[in-house]
Amino acid sequence: MANKQVEISMAEWDVMNIIWGKKSVSANEIVVEIQKYKEVSDKTIRTLITRLYKKEIIKRYKSENIYFYSSNIKEDDIKMKTAKTFLNKLYGGDMKSLVLNFAKNEELNNKEIEELRDILNDISKK
């Protein structure tokens, strides 16, 4: 799984966030959680679960005739891979362009600007 290119759709992120939050969860629990904030059918959610399983992003086990799902990949790992894919696709891998684009187009307050400076200073010390 570590070297495999993994991409998750926006809808699949909803499923993954529930799985990461609960560690082990049934399909019914996932459906209930997503339907609390999104109008989407049971079948659609179950299709997303199946896709994630086929991509080997989640694993499942059966207990008393119910499948339970858990993550097969660390949340931080998939977020980093997704961020790198985004950076490469939209900015040709140029981190400076990404940061400048967000900094110019978002209204950063003084605290956020100072935090960014601190982060950059910490990185430059390494």
Curated annotation (Swiss-Prot):
Keyword set, alphabetical order: Antibiotic resistance, Cytoplasm, DNA-binding, Plasmid, Repressor, Transcription, Transcription regulation, Transposable element
Region entry Important for dimerization, spans: 74-126
Localization of this protein: Cytoplasm
Family: Belongs to the BlaI transcriptional regulatory family.
A Gene Ontology biological process term: negative regulation of DNA-templated transcription
Main location: cytoplasm
Role this protein plays: Transcriptional repressor that constitutively blocks expression of beta-lactamase. Binds DNA as a dimer.
Name of the protein in question: Penicillinase repressor
Subunit structure, interactors included: Homodimer.
DNA-binding region, residue range(s): 7-71
Record PTM text: Upon exposure to beta-lactams, the protease BlaR1 is activated and cleaves BlaI at a single site. This proteolytic cleavage impairs dimerization and abolishes repressor activity.
GO terms assigned for molecular function: DNA binding
Positions bearing the site annotation: Cleavage: 101-102
Organism: Staphylococcus aureus
GO cellular component terms, semicolon-separated: cytoplasm
Pfam families in the cross-refs: Penicillinase_R
